Amino acid sequence: MKSIENIDEFKNLLNPPSKIYYKGNLELLKARKIAVIGSRKMSVYTKNCLLELVALLKKAKICVVSGGALGVDIQAAKIAYPQTIAVFANGLDEVYPKANANEILNIYENALALSENEANYKAKPYDFLLRNRLIIALSEVIIIAQADLKSGSMQSARLALSMNKPIYVLPHRKNESEGTNLLLATKKANLIYDFEEFVKMFGEIYPEQKEDELLNFLKHEDDLEKVLQKFGDKVYEYELEGLVEIFGVKIKTCV
């Protein structure tokens, strides 16, 4: 675990952290960032919405920020991975919640985890509220996917309003996600009608790049005969294009 003195987005907070501890890729801080937060007990409908919406955010090279909690937070992080930042209330040597351990360890390795608390710090209830201010400060806008009236997500909504951060919510039926419905009714949040149009406000949606089967195969095989058996004349086409190099009975990629 390493530390940095501060992050630009935190400097204008009334109570900025004195130090930020991190694991992972600090380059993600340079990306446009959108928070995706919400209920720990999300509905199947919310999960399906996230699968579509967050996948589009990822294609637009937007980094998804969350708290790594159960439910909406970790679902958004999994879809966005490795373009995701998780802000934790606990120290980063304390993996919490344990149910998300695999996903959190992946974030440590290939995405970015942040905390204002030292390595082995065990979070207390008020630390989660303090953590939420960092999520809001870090993000350009806040998406609250689902929330009850009395929830941490509604406290985050109040924080977002105090920081003049736009809030967006998903459409929900009456008596579902009453917190986000209230934000809409009181004109404190905007409704995401169309996922693609929403994402286009923040960046171009790039087509998903498919891994090249032949080049991928060469990552673990350099025997020319075996490669020819599988891909035939395509191997020589790739050689002419300068994508592969053949020397004797061996072959390797040039990219």
Listing of model-derived features with the role each one plays in the protein:
Residues 2-255:
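Glycine-biased, small-residue-rich flexible motifs in mid-sequence functional cores and linkers
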